[in-house]
Amino acid sequence: MLTFARQQQRRNVRWLLSLSLLVLLATLLSLCAGEQWIAPGDWLSARGELFVWQIRLPRTLAVLLVGAALALSGAVMQALFENPLAEPGLLGVSNGAGVGLIAAVLLGQGQLAGWALGLCAIAGALIITLILLRFARRHLSTSRLLLAGVALGIICSALMTWAIYFSTSFDLRQLMYWMMGGFGGVDWQQSWLMIALIPVLIWICCQSQPLNMLALGETSARQLGLPLWFWRNLLVVATGWMVGVSVAMAGAIGFIGLVIPHILRLCGLTDHRVLLPGCALAGAIALLLADVVARLALASAELPIGVVTATLGAPVFIWLLLKSAR
């Protein structure tokens, strides 16, 4: 038994080390790739100063953090709602952030600064989160709370569609494109959004024990002495914050939070002590590679990264649906 535990521990360490190495390689590729390939030896040149340090580095850091946040949000939600198909957009938090942005553009008549739009997106996400918490205070079951989140997402999506359809504002048309997901506008001015993600990411990675209990089901978690109402509310707020900041930075990006936790579980990483840091690393890798594809797929334009992740993630999503139906 002790030998098996040691083998499992070594296997988990090998997984995390391998994912860490892949993060470094993907980061290197992201910094080099673009309309002009800039090798590491040229990073200190005048061209490297502009393209690598001022343009590609902040974008790469944002992609790393958003990928980690979305994958962690998916892992948390799947444990929280005991639903293998749960993902960050499911609770309507992503759409809530979009409604906040559209309201800011309409009320500000396109004159608000980028940081103000970011705050409005976070505010929209947190408002949806607070509504969900109000449902949670009524001690609804997890399945009903999940349905409430789906309904809120549909309402927010309808509001966004109505606002954009009847609007003559060019800013709203651009916002619709931005909501497809993309990091084209990220620079060092968005560093405060990156900093806002880091402490929550670290905190989530340290919450393996309550998440392991929640993954056993509500009844088992309650029998093990977990204050279920407290942890459910706290994790919903943390998830809402991560998704809100991610949407403020890059728009709505789907499937990362759904696919990454599933792939790691299929590889045998079921313990949240390993699954959480593994999701953060794998989510960062997947989104970095998708961002490189979005940049290089077209010669004179950039694909929305949400389109890339949806194209790659939709077949996996269908497979998961078919598998769960069996």
From Swiss-Prot:
GO cellular component terms attached to this protein's record: plasma membrane
GO molecular-function term, one example from the UniProt record: vitamin transmembrane transporter activity
A single GO BP: cobalamin transport
Membrane topology value: Multi-pass membrane protein
Keywords per UniProt: Cell inner membrane, Cell membrane, Membrane, Transmembrane, Transmembrane helix, Transport
Gene3D superfamilies tied to this protein: ABC transporter involved in vitamin B12 uptake, BtuC (1.10.3470.10)
Disulfide bond sites: none
Compartment(s) of residence: Cell inner membrane
Annotated transmembrane regions: 15-35, 61-81, 88-108, 112-132, 146-166, 184-204, 240-260, 274-294, 302-322
Family label: Belongs to the binding-protein-dependent transport system permease family. FecCD subfamily.
Known function: Part of the ABC transporter complex BtuCDF involved in vitamin B12 import. Involved in the translocation of the substrate across the membrane.
Record note on quaternary structure: The complex is composed of two ATP-binding proteins (BtuD), two transmembrane proteins (BtuC) and a solute-binding protein (BtuF).
Protein name: Vitamin B12 import system permease protein BtuC
Lineage, top ranks: Bacteria, Pseudomonadati, Pseudomonadota, Gammaproteobacteria, Enterobacterales
